[in-house]
Amino acid sequence: MVLMKTPICNFGEKAIDFNLPGTDGKQWSLDDCVGEKGTLLMFICNHCPYVKSIQTRLIDDVLKLMDIGINSVAIMSNDPDDYPEDSFENMQKVAAEYNFPFPYLIDESQEIAKAYGAICTPDFFGYNAALELQYRGRLDDSGMKPPSNNSKHDLLEAMIDVANTGNGPKHQIPSMGCSIKWKNSA
């Protein structure tokens, strides 16, 4: 497991369209996922201990964001041939087990992860209503540990600002996680 950190937010960068299959059997595009006040696009997977440790907290925050007009979508771009736990069938199981309140999509070609510049799981891209990037940071300050009563909810707070003002915070702390497992181009 290689620990990676996300780069700084490239404020204003436009979201890139996609057309990917979801664990629900539907094809999803960016337009299908857009929220009235913003959109949270997340690169996650099933096997990464960083993602596993935040799963419940992430869902809690996504539900709060839905209440204020921000929709979320998760994309899995790892190579399932090398990481079978990230197979589409296992994605379906995880989505059902946690009752994901967002589409969980597979990027089998890895083209979408490359287009977005995603580097790790989790990697969060928070967009305003105009689909301009405003947040590229961590979920919270707990990392892989259980949150304390005074934990800072970076993602939630940033996306509330995005919903209210269209702008994310200037100071953002990178997300940390496992590197995306790229296919060998042999």
Briefly describe each language-model feature range.
Residues 1-164, 168-172, 179, 186:
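Chalcogenol-based redox active-site neighborhoods
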